[in-house]
């Protein structure tokens, strides 16, 4: 019996540009690592770049499980955390390094959900988290892209379409769909394609059973000439989707991500976001861009990101931990307020409340 021919989704070569960014080697343990490093950074006072680096490196080495790790791996941690999450600010001209507002925010609040929402809210391409050469490629392609915002807009569009078709299903997206239909298509990342069009493409592709990853496609080839695995091709979109899940914006089922139903306010904040770091705008008009000039923008980028740490923008709602809003939520919310504001609360009161929340979550 002849095998059925497989149809693959094709992004024309002229529109294909692979989005990539720093991928922490500790991603599988990101929650513990970020909380630990934020706490440790806040123990280091403003000091010379050399002293800060030394104390910062020692803190990485003391993280559980790192003591016997090779120095090369530890140094990778040292560069990845500030590149992506900006936990410290380094002024090489003045020879001063100090812990950033981002690290202080996470240290003081111990709220990784809120921290990652704020991180995702400002995360964009181009951004100072990228190497200058990669920035040049992004700018030459005319890319201006905020991943979390686009993903949420696409999911909202998909929900509307499904509702109009009378479907009770919720729109979802996989890392593979996000990679090919959003991240690596310049028409999308440069803003020439709407969220409605992207959602419709994904739904149409599902109906037609169109596949995405093709190991024989030239776009799947690495610099060595070998085909990248599906995981390699989809890892960057997958990272953002995972961060959005940890940030309690999305939930994942069998590799597909959909919006959290009780986080509408936060989701709308992302969908309606018009903020943008404009430090790279002048380079879009240039034919020849010097990497040194791009490097000068990096401190401005991290200043922008740190100034974006506004606690009032997103607040973790205890009801999102317990579940959908119903009668029991009101009881929990009232009891939480009583315990938090009471002058004569006891550790037993707090313990009982915590146990109740855990039971509700389970």
Question: Which residues does each predicted region cover?
Answer:
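A short, surface-exposed helix-loop junction/capping segment
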Residues: 58-59, 215-224, 330-348
């Amino acid at each position: 019996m002849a095998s059925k021919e497989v149809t693959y989704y094709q992004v024309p070569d002229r529109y294909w540009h692979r989005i990539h960014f720093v991928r922490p080697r500790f991603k599988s343990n990101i929650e513990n690592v970020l909380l630990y490093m934020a706490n440790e950074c806040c123990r280091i006072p403003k000091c010379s770049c050399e002293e800060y680096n030394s104390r910062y490196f020692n803190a990485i080495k003391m993280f559980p499980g790192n003591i016997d790790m090779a120095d090369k791996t530890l140094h990778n941690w040292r560069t990845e955390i500030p590149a992506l999450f900006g936990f410290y600010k380094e002024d090489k001209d003045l020879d001063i390094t100090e812990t950033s507002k981002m690290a202080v925010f996470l240290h003081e609040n111990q709220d990784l959900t809120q921290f990652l929402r704020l991180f995702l809210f400002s995360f964009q391409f181009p951004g100072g988290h990228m190497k200058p050469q990669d920035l040049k490629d992004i700018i030459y392609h005319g890319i201006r892209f905020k991943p979390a915002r686009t993903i949420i807009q696409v999911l909202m569009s998909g929900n509307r379409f499904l509702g109009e078709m009378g479907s009770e299903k919720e729109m979802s997206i996989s890392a593979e769909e996000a990679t090919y239909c959003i991240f690596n298509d310049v028409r999308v990342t440069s803003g020439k394609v709407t969220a409605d069009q992207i959602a419709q493409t994904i739904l149409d592709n599902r109906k037609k059973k169109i596949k995405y990853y093709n190991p024989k496609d030239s776009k799947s080839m690495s610099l060595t000439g070998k085909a990248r695995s599906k995981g390699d091709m989809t890892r960057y979109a997958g990272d953002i989707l995972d961060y959005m899940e940890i940030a309690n914006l999305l939930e994942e089922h069998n590799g597909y991500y959909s919006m959290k139903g009780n986080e509408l306010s936060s989701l709308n904040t992302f969908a309606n976001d018009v903020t943008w770091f404009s430090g790279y705008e002048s380079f879009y008009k240039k034919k020849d861009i010097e990497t040194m000039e791009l490097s000068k923008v990096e401190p401005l980028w991290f200043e922008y990101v740190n100034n974006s740490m506004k606690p009032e923008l997103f607040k973790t709602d205890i009801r999102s931990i317990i579940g959908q809003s119903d009668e029991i939520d009101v009881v929990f919310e009232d009891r939480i307020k009583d315990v938090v504001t009471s002058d004569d609360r006891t550790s037993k009161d707090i313990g009982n409340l915590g146990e109740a929340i855990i039971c509700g979550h389970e």
